[in-house]
Amino acid sequence: MSDTSESGAGLTRFQAEASEKDSSSMMQTLLTVTQNVEVPETPKASKALEVSEDVKVSKASGVSKATEVSKTPEAREAPATQASSTTQLTDTQVLAAENKSLAADTKKQNADPQAVTMPATETKKVSHVADTKVNTKAQETEAAPSQAPADEPEPESAAAQSQENQDTRPKVKAKKARKVKHLDGEEDGSSDQSQASGTTGGRRVSKALMASMARRASRGPIAFWARRASRTRLAAWARRALLSLRSPKARRGKARRRAAKLQSSQEPEAPPPRDVALLQGRANDLVKYLLAKDQTKIPIKRSDMLKDIIKEYTDVYPEIIERAGYSLEKVFGIQLKEIDKNDHLYILLSTLEPTDAGILGTTKDSPKLGLLMVLLSIIFMNGNRSSEAVIWEVLRKLGLRPGIHHSLFGDVKKLITDEFVKQKYLDYARVPNSNPPEYEFFWGLRSYYETSKMKVLKFACKVQKKDPKEWAAQYREAMEADLKAAAEAAAEAKARAEIRARMGIGLGSENAAGPCNWDEADIGPWAKARIQAGAEAKAKAQESGSASTGASTSTNNSASASASTSGGFSAGASLTATLTFGLFAGLGGAGASTSGSSGACGFSYK
């Protein structure tokens, strides 16, 4: 009883001193109490095992151990001395064990919850409680008068330990719930336990962070429920509020605005208003330019049109070119044709009645075009290519030799290797890997549009006085080429009509720039002759219903008197016809043989 009264007096005295001291002295006292409690001398990793050993020893010794301690005061002083000697060594170990136990709680999620390492204070409490259960008298005996100040704050340390146990238990439950979620895929249990544990993404939430999140949640839509919830659930709700700051309605509104912006960016902007009169005036200038440039029969480059005529209106050059093409068709009967999509080369083609050869030109150029038809026939009949040696073999039989000036053709070699090549009537290329170098002739791009293989075949058969079907391979190839060209022409005409309808061409806008007097324009005699030929062609088309053989003869005579060469071999083209037929007649006589063998150009000379 005396011991009990002394311990009560010591407790009263400790409380009086604690009220007078500041917080630092109280913490020092708590550290002293922790140091005076029995601490094993073994390393801190084996503290849990030592607790169980203390329990076993206390159970085995029983009352006898307590009796010995009560009888011998020296035995009471020995543990106190030992504890005081090891105070400096165990103080750091106890603090480190407490810190490591808190850090280990978050790392061991998949481990057994029962195997969580307890803090050092809890170990001491277990040993103290075990000794109390075995023998309460032994516990009272160990409380010596000298240790009374150290044992007096024991109730406060017990309260702190119980608080730590309460903080630890929900965390263990949260680990169990996360394990169940991993195995069974249950979301409700894990979310509730994570809310109870006060963790965010596997990390412990500090009190300051929870307070901040709670303040934010109090201003949000969950403020009513936040006032009725615990601190841990409040932290979880605050975390949810932070993760979803925008409501679903706000997100849907933002998605709609983004979709509307994307749709508006994809929609083509309305073109600015156009000055049709200005565009048509520039198109009329381009028509004059094209007629003047085509006199040389060299294809016209689009870059030249942009540089010389269109100039600053490069953003609307497709409409200017299309308007110029429409004016050429309606006024002159000429089609503006792009023959090379890569280099953007344009030529002018006649839409009037074609000649037998299919190539139109002035009277001065008619002999040259007659020679060109001979060359195209040789190339086509020899498989769409012919070597330069074969070409000159045929021309020598016609009296034409390289290096010798001719009265009609001038320098023949320059004509067929330079002028016809520049005009895109022929292609002149070197034979690969030839030594000494050899060259071949092919049809040029212009020849495919101004004439056709069927026309060339008929021209050759007319010279030979044969039916085109006798040349079976060439006739089949010519038929396939005509079908392909007709399909391409139909598709191109449809596309051109759609483009012109979209641009408003052909609806009277071509008169926006006012009437244009083409007779006074400096477009050259050939263009003026084309205007006259176009007028005659329209008149002939109107009289075609009542035309007869005599009318056809008079039409040919009138056409031969004009500068145009439309409507068969006219007087201007009679020289070409005479030259061509004379050449083939001489070639037939020179190349004739008793066996009826074929000549160099593939014709059978009989």
Swiss-Prot record:
The lineage of its organism: Eukaryota, Metazoa, Chordata, Craniata, Vertebrata. It is linked to Bartter syndrome 5, antenatal, transient: An X-linked recessive form of Bartter syndrome, a disorder characterized by impaired salt reabsorption in the thick ascending loop of Henle with pronounced salt wasting, hypokalemic metabolic alkalosis, and varying degrees of hypercalciuria. BARTS5 is an antenatal form beginning in utero with marked fetal polyuria that leads to polyhydramnios and premature delivery. It is characterized by severe but transient symptoms that can resolve with age. Residues 1-204, 248-275, 534-563 are annotated as: Disordered. This is Melanoma-associated antigen D2. One of its GO terms (biological process) is negative regulation of transcription by RNA polymerase II. Residues 171-181, 248-260 have a biased composition (Basic residues). The keyword S-adenosyl-L-methionine does not apply. Keywords: Acetylation, Bartter syndrome, Disease variant, Phosphoprotein, Tumor antigen. Residues 142-164 have a biased composition (Low complexity). SMART domains: MAGE. Interacts with GNAS. May interact with DNAJB1. The modification Phosphoserine is found at residues 5, 157, 190-191, 194, 197, 244, 247, 264-265. Residues 122-131 have a biased composition (Basic and acidic residues).
